[in-house]
Amino acid sequence: TPSDGFMGMR
């Protein structure tokens, strides 16, 4: 999940 640390949507 690349967006896990960013927003956690993917």
UniProtKB/Swiss-Prot annotation:
Q: Which residues carry this modification: Arginine amide?
A: R10
Protein's cellular compartments: Secreted
Per UniProt, the keywords (alphabetical) are:
Amidation, Neuropeptide, Secreted
Top-level division of the source organism's lineage: Eukaryota
- What is the documented function of this protein? Myoactive peptide. Increases the amplitude and frequency of spontaneous contractions and tonus of hindgut muscle.
**Name this polypeptide is given:** Tachykinin-related peptide 4
What does UniProt give as GO cellular component?
Answer: extracellular region
